[in-house]
Amino acid sequence: MVDICPFVHLSAEGSFFMYFTDQLEENMAWLNQALHVDKNFDVVYRVLTIADKKACLYFIDGFTKDDSLLKILQGFSSIKADDIPEDAHSFSKKYLPYGEIGLLSDSREMIIQLLSGVSCLFIDGYNKCLTIDCRTYPARGVSEPEKDKVMRGSRDGFVETLVFNTALIRRRIRDPKLIMEILTAGESSHTDIAMCYMEGRADKKLIEKIRKRIQTVEVDALSMNQESLAECIFPGKWFNPFPKFKFSERPDTSAASILEGNIVILVDNSPSAMILPSSVFDIIEEADDYYFPPVTGTYLRLSRMLISLLSMLLTPTWLMLMQNTELIPYWLRFIQLSDPCNIPLVWQLLILEFAIDGLRLAAVNTPNMLTTPLSVIAGIVLGEYAVESGWFNSETMLYMAFVTIANYSQASFELGYAMKFMRIIILVCTAVFNIWGFIAGIIFSFCAIIFNRTIAGKSYIYPLIPLHLNELKKRFLRGRLPHKLGNNGN
């Protein structure tokens, strides 16, 4: 570092910072300039007197609990001049005995903490800053996630405040071996990231690998939270649409994954937890499998797997059979077209693929009061008149309706869109190359799954490849609870 003046320095990153002095005016002059207090209306500083010493309190308007701060300031009013300690550490022990109190000697960490909501107190004669954590964030209440709903089980879900989310997990795992490491990423955002795992159960090499990748992330801000972080810590194979991580907004699912030896990453400002390593079986698995008896849970799991597979293969298989009607057995003759086609089947299917996505986007951006009218217009008016006008055949509408509903049989949007992309590829290959295109499209789709890898470097479809019969049985059949200690083999 290069000295600029006795108390201002240049960091290795090229930014100026200050080592605090025992002169309050010098500290305030530097900080007021660095924080642009003349322009930032929400950066507040108050000059006060503690006994016979001048002091200054910095805080962010909207991030501070007014009642907590008021109690602290009221306590300062009773301090006498003879009772002032000689150093900041003694002052914090004597007059700030409760709460999270820290001491900082330079402006780098102090500014980051201040902008995250921590109040900072400077006292003339002390060369350190006292940080007082009495912050509060604007937050919504804990409620059931809109996407990860269950038929039975807890109704709480993660919110956008990191400490609330860690508390929801800690409430379920009251074990000192539950480790929650705090990391930061983003040169401008300094986003807090919590890495949660069970000591002795999670893979130590994987923990170190993830920690190192997060610490070495070179990004200005995690503007998209988990997705931004995922792309940073797993930069390879972006062209493969199958998700490398499982995302969940349920604390019970996250806690169960931690107990199985997985690692859960929570990002501040995001209500989703990133669970890793995750195979395709982990992503398809849902909480309902364990909130019902083993037989019911097994049925739900197998149904979800079958429906997800059908959502990818149904329309390409039907298109292939329509192009080769001689392959249709007698008992399946009813699947043939009842009316002639005005538009080739492959174009009907592709148009409906994009039309359904358009309706989905419209539903997301439609006010709640208009959602029902939109559904009526889309489902009845457009569907019925599209068939009557000759744009689409009724069979095409039927099979695409099934595929649309089947996409919602599992909770992962990422997996749903990955299967959609594979379905479109198989459709196009089938339309161009007929049976051989159908076979090639299926081979390509399954290669995209087979050659995918988790962040731990293991097979994406373990225990199917490599084959492990006991683990494969657990993936398809829901066994009795509780599970044995240890990881899940990913």
Predicted feature descriptions by range:
Residues 1-317, 321, 327, 449-490:
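Membrane-embedded alpha-helical signal segments
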Residues 174, 215, 360, 387, ...:
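Short polybasic/polar patches that bind polyanions
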Residues 272, 278-426:
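Transmembrane alpha-helical segments that form the functional core of multipass membrane systems
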Residues 394-396, 400-490:
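Hydrophobic alpha-helical transmembrane segments of membrane transport and translocation systems
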